[in-house]
Design a protein with these regions (language model features):
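Conserved NTP-binding/hydrolysis module of P-loop NTPases
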Residues: 18-20, 24-46
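Short, structured loop/turn "capping" segments at alpha-beta junctions
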Residues: 44-48, 68-70, 103-104, 154-155
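Conserved P-loop NTPase "ATPase switch" module shared by AAA+ and STAND
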Residues: 61-85
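The catalytic "switch" region of P-loop NTPases
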Residues: 77-82, 89-170
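The conserved phosphate-sensing helix
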Residues: 172-174
Length: 174
């Protein structure tokens, strides 16, 4: 696969965003998630708008933008809320999946798994996959080689050279 830098088409009637990535936000609230989705889609919203007011706008925009996969990072932040807030955040994620029929990918720390376990229905919708820590091993070097072949550079960058690979591993903290 090649990475392409495709500029926005000003003549297009609507945005086409097959994969949308958002962060749960520091409070882990349902409203915060909806506001972040609207922000990623450059959509205006009322600063005091409630979750119930924002939700239909988010649905409409996700549909018209062609979103097929919604990636929610920092899912473990839901844990910061009280029981009612956690239930509302998880219910909102569940409703987005139901109403849109899209794939939702949740990312976060091990606490994200605990968060999902608060709602058995939502827990069944997510299959956990653990990402291993990067190290000086065949998998890491293979990934770096694969990335290098995808980068549209004039000259090879040598990502898997020991010196560069060590720097990447150290800077990313594995």
């Amino acid at each position: 696969a090649k990475l392409q830098n495709l500029p926005d088409d000003p003549r297009a009637s609507k945005a086409n965003v097959p994969v949308l990535v958002v962060s749960m936000g520091p409070t882990g609230s349902a409203r915060g998630l909806l506001v972040r989705i609207l922000g990623q889609l450059n959509a205006p919203y009322g600063k005091s708008a409630s979750t119930d007011t924002l939700y239909p706008d988010v649905l409409r925009l996700l549909r018209t933008s062609g979103v097929k996969i919604l990636v929610i990072d920092e899912l473990h932040h839901i844990e910061k809320g009280n029981r009612k807030q956690r239930e509302e955040a998880l219910a909102t994620i569940k409703l987005l999946g139901n109403d849109l029929g899209i794939t939702i990918v949740g990312c976060g720390t091990i606490a994200a798994l605990r968060t999902l376990r608060w709602d058995p229905q939502i827990e069944r919708r997510f299959e956990p996959h653990r990402l291993e820590v990067w190290g000086h091993n065949e998998q890491t070097y293979g990934l770096l080689n694969s990335l290098e072949t995808c980068l549209p550079l004039r000259h090879a960058s040598g990502l898997s050279d020991d010196k560069i690979a060590t720097w990447i591993i150290n800077e990313s903290e594995g």
